[in-house]
């Protein structure tokens, strides 16, 4: 290989530490949680376009798959799901650069002189197709890729290779990529750092047999991260192979538009002993017993994520001594009970949809039991949720006793509706359950009466979707006058309600601070922002909620 390499193929997320070599030291593992999230309002906009459970689970043959309305519905759902998935471990979009220096012995193959461990490290940072091509460089390189830890993505094996998970792949392209995956799994000895299989249908009989072979290969060859995303036509009535539970090296697992393996009858040893992150995106399960089984058999699980509709809606019981973050985004669940999760600091429930026509009416019940480490909770919405703390149902006018308080929570996000009288009455009772809150995020609200966390602890208030209505201004006025510790007030304007942020800022300042001395909470800094809309509004990603290097994942909207 002529020349001296001074650049390398870059990726959005290096796989260096995820593909260890035998002797060479690996650089510190970069956090896999690197993508920005969106405000809850923009997340709701994206989520509202997600297809309904009926349209997704409807058996779709070749004729129905051509239905333009069904295709559009599934495409929107896939687009929403894909935004929740982790970034690729390696990239086909990186650049490879080199320079030739005659003074430094140009033309001499210096890379081939490196130890095998370092060469395997080089190959492991390449997409599978490029990694295989290194065998053609010289005799020295031929055996390297066969023993290098690989990142295998079928999207990289498409004729038009891409990092993105495509919402539509032609049958010919999907078959070609699947054939390439089969060849790689047959000849490569492993290990596989990551396998992302997302470009083909997994429901047809031939595809199911092929998937079973793939999973067997990956289990034997120690895959560490696995993403399985089904493509239309979707049926969801056939279970994934139970081979999934033989992948004992798995640390991260994401499934989308698939039916979870039946857990009844699995051998006693079936488990995910190293699994740290599990994401279920529009997945069908036999019932809450399957989820209970997964939690019980995943002793290292730290992050649990739900995106899109679960079939059927789950009764989620959180019993885990390892869980640190649970996120539920636009997913219908009947209830979320934190039964025993002593190490859980984050519970994020966003945009859970209301019951649709023909469904049993009622809210998703959120019960907080043994969660002494819980520090962040939101977005709670009384139109969608009912709250229970211990054995106490929290309703408007509830006299909150010590047993109904969660003093560990420091960051709280709420969604209250000014024009709904019951919401306005509910807010004071709800806030009294969280007496130590320091950072409060509100999507429309109303209140009254003395509240400990408001008076003594809240330092930051972020108010989303401000429209300038009298009820909104009255709430902000109450809050500013009551909150003795308030340091920053951030008002995020709803799109199209003001000609400029200056107009909105003037209206807020006039209502809150006009004629008042700069004393007490009047010293709080006011920041008025314009809400991002449309394509400029980033989508909520689980990577942000699970990134513990960020003290407050909701704070992305607040400039620091």
Residue ranges of predicted features:
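Conserved hydrophobic position(s) of the canonical leucine-rich repeat
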Residues: 192, 223, 250, 275-278, ...
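C-terminal closing repeat unit and adjoining cap/tail of repeat-based domains
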Residues: 67-77, 444-560
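Solvent-exposed loop/turn tips at the surfaces of repeat/solenoid architectures
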Residues: 200, 231, 253-258, 278-283, ...
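CRL adaptor-proximal regions
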Residues: 2-18, 34-113, 554, 558-560
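A structural signal for leucine-rich repeat
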Residues: 242-247, 266-274, 291-299, 315-323, ...
């Amino acid at each position: 290989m002529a020349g001296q390499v001074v650049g390398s193929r870059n990726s959005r997320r290096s796989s260096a530490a995820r593909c260890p070599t035998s002797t060479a030291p690996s650089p510190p593992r970069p956090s896999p949680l690197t993508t920005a999230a969106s405000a809850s309002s923009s997340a709701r906009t994206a989520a509202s376009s997600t297809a309904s459970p009926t349209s997704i689970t409807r058996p779709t043959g070749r004729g129905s798959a051509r239905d333009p309305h069904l295709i559009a519905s599934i495409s929107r759902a896939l687009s929403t799901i894909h935004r929740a998935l982790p970034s690729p471990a390696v990239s086909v979009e990186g650049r490879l650069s080199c320079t030739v220096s005659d003074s430094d012995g140009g033309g001499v193959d210096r890379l081939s002189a490196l130890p095998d461990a370092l060469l395997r490290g080089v190959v492991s940072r390449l997409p599978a197709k490029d990694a295989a091509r290194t065998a053609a460089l010289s005799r020295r390189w031929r055996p390297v890729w066969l023993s290098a830890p690989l990142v295998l993505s079928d999207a990289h094996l498409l004729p038009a290779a891409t990092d993105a998970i495509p919402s539509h792949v032609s049958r010919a392209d999907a078959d070609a990529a699947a054939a390439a995956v089969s060849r790689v799994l047959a000849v490569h000895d492993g290990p596989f750092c990551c396998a992302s299989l997302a470009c083909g249908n997994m429901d047809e009989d031939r595809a199911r047999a092929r998937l079973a072979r793939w999973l067997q290969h990956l289990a034997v060859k120690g895959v560490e991260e696995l993403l399985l995303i089904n493509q239309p036509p979707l049926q969801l009535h056939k279970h994934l192979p139970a081979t999934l539970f033989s992948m004992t090296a798995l640390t991260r697992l994401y499934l989308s538009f698939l039916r979870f393996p039946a857990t009844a009858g699995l051998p006693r040893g079936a488990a995910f002993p190293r699994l740290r992150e599990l994401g279920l995106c529009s997945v069908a399960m036999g019932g809450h017993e399957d989820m209970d089984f997964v939690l019980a058999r995943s002793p290292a699980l730290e992050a649990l994520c739900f995106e899109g509709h679960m079939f059927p809606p789950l009764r989620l019981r959180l019993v885990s001594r390892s869980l640190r973050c649970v996120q539920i985004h636009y997913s219908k669940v009947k209830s979320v009970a934190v039964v025993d999760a002593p190490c859980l600091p984050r519970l994020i429930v966003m945009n859970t949809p209301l019951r649709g026509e023909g469904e049993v009416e009622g809210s998703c019940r959120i019960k907080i039991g043994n969660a002494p480490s819980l520090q962040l909770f939101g977005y709670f919405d009384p139109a969608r949720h009912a709250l229970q703390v211990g054995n106490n149902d929290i309703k408007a006018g509830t006299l909150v006793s010590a047993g109904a308080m969660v003093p560990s929570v420091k960051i709280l996000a709420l969604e209250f509706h000014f024009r709904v009288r019951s919401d306005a009455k509910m807010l004071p009772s709800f806030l009294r359950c969280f007496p130590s809150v320091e950072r409060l995020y509100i999507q429309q609200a109303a209140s009254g009466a003395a509240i400990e966390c408001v008076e003594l602890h809240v330092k930051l208030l972020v108010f989303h979707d401000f429209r300038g209505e009298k009820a909104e201004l009255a709430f902000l006025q109450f809050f500013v006058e009551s909150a003795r510790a308030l340091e920053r007030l951030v008002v995020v304007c709803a799109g199209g309600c003001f000609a400029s942020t200056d107009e909105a800022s003037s209206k807020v300042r006039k209502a809150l601070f006009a004629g008042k001395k700069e004393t007490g909470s009047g010293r709080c800094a006011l920041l008025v922002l314009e809400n991002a809309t449309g394509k400029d509004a980033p989508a909520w990603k689980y990577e942000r909620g699970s990134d513990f290097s960020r003290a407050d994942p909701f704070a992305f909207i607040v400039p620091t």
